[in-house]
Amino acid sequence: MTSALLGLQIVLAVLIVVVVLLQKSSSIGLGAYSGSNDSLFGAKGPASFMAKLTMFLGLLFVINTIALGYFYNKEYGKSVLDETKTNKELSPLVPATGTLNPTLNPTLNPTLNPLEQAPTNPLMPTQTPKELPKEPAKTPFVESPKQNEKNEKNDAKENGIKGVEKNKENAKTPPTTHQKPKTHATTNAHTNQKKDEK
């Protein structure tokens, strides 16, 4: 049945292609997709014989596609698992006799039971909590050099002492071991190198 429907499907597809190619174009590129010629009963009246034949063949194509899908699914819709044989004589997972190892049984071996006995009142704590410290421990505050300079300026203004402010050279932190102080010669060499690259 499916082979006959498949053959009919191929014939219908070829006929639809031939009928569509034989039709005369109604719009011929003018006003495409927006004119009245694109409607079913265009400006020239009802559709011609070829247009009706195209619609009929298209309807047959859709019906044949649905029928082909239904019969194909009915014929070949069986699962592979339906045809497999099951072995009904399976060995039992637990031996019928009581030959279990008693050391693996948690009721016979209390060391295998990790859970302790539940307390009679689970809302009551078993231990008393330790007292909390009265004051939190104070941590030392380390200021950055810039913040330290600002604080010194503010203190000097508050005390009304003039001339206490440090100049920028004294306020700078000394360079660390991984920082090299730049000299005038190194900066000039760097700018000369950029000029040479240009």
UniProtKB/Swiss-Prot annotation:
Pfam families with a match to the protein in the record: SecG
* UniProt gene name: secG
The entry's protein name is: Protein-export membrane protein SecG
Keywords, alphabetical: Cell membrane, Membrane, Protein transport, Translocation, Transmembrane, Transmembrane helix, Transport
* Single GO MF descriptor: protein-transporting ATPase activity
Q: Which species does this protein come from?
A: Helicobacter pylori (strain J99 / ATCC 700824)
Basic and acidic residues compositional bias, start-end: 146-171
GO CC term (a single one): plasma membrane
Q: Where is the composition biased (Low complexity)?
A: 99-115
